[in-house]
From Swiss-Prot:
The lineage of its organism: Bacteria, Pseudomonadati, Pseudomonadota, Betaproteobacteria, Neisseriales. Condensation of UDP-2,3-diacylglucosamine and 2,3-diacylglucosamine-1-phosphate to form lipid A disaccharide, a precursor of lipid A, a phosphorylated glycolipid that anchors the lipopolysaccharide to the outer membrane of the cell. One of its GO terms (cellular component) is membrane. Belongs to the LpxB family. It catalyses: a lipid X + a UDP-2-N,3-O-bis[(3R)-3-hydroxyacyl]-alpha-D-glucosamine = a lipid A disaccharide + UDP + H(+). The gene is lpxB. The keyword Lipid metabolism applies. Pathway: Bacterial outer membrane biogenesis; LPS lipid A biosynthesis. Keywords: Glycosyltransferase, Lipid A biosynthesis, Lipid biosynthesis, Lipid metabolism, Transferase. Its EC number is 2.4.1.182. One of its GO terms (biological process) is lipid A biosynthetic process. This is Lipid-A-disaccharide synthase. NCBIfam families: lpxB (TIGR00215). InterPro entries: Glyco_trans_19 (IPR003835). One of its GO terms (molecular function) is lipid-A-disaccharide synthase activity.
């Protein structure tokens, strides 16, 4: 752990970062790289995943312990999550970082930020919560909790500005990093998939709790597609070692004995580019599929209690980011009771068998890519270092 210092050397600022899931780990890794380009001596600590640690980040706690989704699922783990948050606040108040950056995971990170801001430590939140979709009353509280919000989508900053806060659109890092052009042939060669066969990608989530709900449904869907397309190949990128282990456990069930599935270590972009169509849970992964210009079917199941709560609160007609950003149902969303293998398989087959529909969708996804494409990591790094006084 970095030692406490009474005098701050702005050439080597101590930057605290906290992430709660795999998508935040990716954002954090890009942010660290950009910070180090501007300030090579920066020191970084807090909570991070494997990608951040590969960039030299010192993680004080296991990021996987925070990776849960849904009201019921969070309640089960709440005592542990609250303990980690208390201990992180204690550690950071002792270390006195020059700035704190919470990346996504707002229910965890905004509580940390509020306590640190009260102690005089500048705070930023990177990735606005979906206040435009539900719980818009949170905006005023977030303005109180952090000094600045870094937004990934263009409709978000004005909500904070109207509430007297500071916010800016920095673009989405995936749009910056992913090429605009499509290259399915190269992706298939990389993964050893023949160009002439049907290829479907399965993305059942980056959290173990998501795998438990979605992997069995996705695997049953794959078996139905295999009946329709006997030569089909199925690809699945595992976000973390923990999800990879859980996927292996599900695949060992007798009902999936006939399913040949290629599980990759991450490589989600390559997997999506190689696919003719993608079955994906809601969340950031849907945007990655869109930026790969691939047709998709969005599906999600959570506990009935969680779903009933969310359905009452949500203020937008869609759950998938591509549909929300395009303002229409460009791709199917089959949720909860609609998330049946028969329906999912039929929707994926519809994309595979109608290339004209795919071509029109790719035009929409290309325009969306251009809208979100900025030098995101550098813009975020500049804001972080400004708040740190560098």
């Amino acid at each position: 752990m970095w030692g406490q210092t009474n005098m701050v050397d702005k050439k080597s600022p101590l930057i605290a970062v906290s992430v709660g899931e795999a998508s935040g780990d990716l954002l954090g890794a890009h942010l660290i790289r950009a910070i180090r380009k501007r300030c090579p001596q920066a020191r970084l600590t807090g909570i991070g995943g494997e990608l951040m640690k590969a960039e030299g980040f010192e993680s004080l706690y296991d990021q996987e312990r925070l990776a849960v989704r849904g009201f019921v699922e969070v309640v089960r783990r709440l005592p542990e999550i609250l303990r980690i948050r208390r201990e992180l606040v204690r550690d950071l108040l002792s270390l006195k970082p020059d700035v704190f950056v919470g990346i996504d995971a707002p229910d965890f990170n905004l509580g940390v930020a509020e306590k640190l801001k009260r102690a005089g430590i500048p705070t930023l939140h990177y990735v606005s919560p979906s206040v435009w979709a539900w719980r818009r009353e949170r905006v005023g509280k977030i303005v109180h909790q952090v000094n600045r919000v870094l937004c990934l989508f263009p409709m978000e900053p004005q909500l904070y500005l109207d509430a007297g806060g500071r916010a800016e659109f920095v673009g989405h890092p995936m749009a910056q990093l992913m090429p605009l052009e499509d290259d399915r042939e190269t992706a298939r060669k990389t993964l050893g998939a023949d160009v002439g066969i049907p290829v479907f990608a399965l993305l059942p989530g980056s959290r173990v709790s998501e795998i438990d709900y979605m992997a069995p449904v996705f695997f049953q869907t794959a078996l139905l597609l295999l009946e329709r397309y006997p030569a089909a190949r199925f690809l699945l990128p595992a976000a973390t070692e923990a999800t990879k282990r859980r996927l292996a456990e599900v695949l060992q069930r007798p009902e999936f004995a006939g399913l040949a599935l290629t599980v990759t270590d991450r490589q989600s972009e390559t997997v999506c580019r190689a696919a003719d169509a993608v079955l994906v849970t809601s969340g950031t992964a849907t945007l990655e599929v869109a930026l790969c210009k691939r047709p998709m079917v969005i599906s999600y199941k959570i506990s009935p209690l969680t779903y009933a709560y969310v359905k009452r609160k949500i203020k937008v007609p869609h759950v998938g980011l591509p549909n929300i950003l395009l303002g229409k149902e460009a791709v199917p969303e089959l949720l909860q009771s609609e998330a049946k293998p028969e329906k999912l398989a039929a929707a994926l087959a519809d994309w595979y068998e109608h290339p004209d529909k795919v071509a029109a969708l790719q035009q929409d996804f290309g325009a969306l890519h251009l809208l979100l494409k900025k030098d995101t990591a550098d813009l975020a790094a500049r804001a972080v270092l400004e708040e740190a006084g560098c």
